[in-house]
Amino acid sequence: MNNKRITVFRKEHFNAAHRLNNPAWSAEHNKAVFGLCNNENFHGHNYELIVQVSGEIDPETGYLIDLKILSDLIKEQVLNRFDHKNLNLDTQEFKDLNPTAENIAVVIYDLIRAKLDERYTLKIRLYETERNFVEYPTEW
């Protein structure tokens, strides 16, 4: 190994609707906690996804990872599942999981991690709005 660690980023966008709701709670408690995000008719976001992959540069290719391969992986595992979908109704991943930005980021991480070579480290940054975003995993 050449010990030249580097990080590459791939940015993608997808649009999805969702509703934040805990079925164990009363309607009043859901509204108090989730506010407008608890709208029974759902609401949507134009998500910005940044996938960060780190590792060592391959001395044969000069790449960390071929970005076309990473792009195809994101399309297959994330965009095809979630783009222009109602996350609560149209996806298996959120049938029983509240589709908060935090949970969406963890699900995306798990989907990509399962298909990404173990030699790479992975981090997901998901923007729900221009000012609100989450990152997973995080260091303690």
How should each PLM-predicted stretch be described?
Residues 1-140:
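Charge-rich, low-complexity N-terminal segments
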